[in-house]
Amino acid sequence: AFDGITVACMAHELHKNLSGGRISKIAQPETDELLLTIKSQEGNFRLLLSASASLPLVYLTQTNKPSPLTAPNFCMLLRKHISGGRIIAVTQPSMERILRFEIEHLDEMGDQCRKFLIVELMGKYSNIIFCTPDDKIIDSIKHISAQISSVREVLPGRDYFIPQAAGKKDPLSSDEAVFKETLS
């Protein structure tokens, strides 16, 4: 399982390698998995994003995975919106086990716009969520209704938010005194 510090390192490494890169291919080889092919100045990369309950992962790979002949709806939606899009940034909000990919693309009218692909690496609660800049959910790889979760719904049209973590502190941005106080 990933922790916030590991995800911070991943965000830094992915940002370094993928920022400015264009998404040339989007595949969904498994029901809870995406494989993005990205062409950047650093080279060509395959980025695997998995929201598997048993093994959520994000990693760069050289391996290509076979995809179904008919792409699932979530994959088709991503292709429509962000295929050919440019990755602006890969960030981690507030030491959470979340990676946020900011993607700039052209809409149907040829206007530049931004979208966010958010990967939550939280064990059985892992998900991949596609959002607008004002945090409206366009769609997600797993739909979570009010019957499934009393904390939040992850459905198209709903607001995206990160459930509040009680009293979490960011060890990477704390000064020495706060860090020592937290440990004692």
Which residue stretches match the model-derived regions?
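Phosphate/anion-contacting hairpin/loop surfaces
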Residues: 2, 41-184
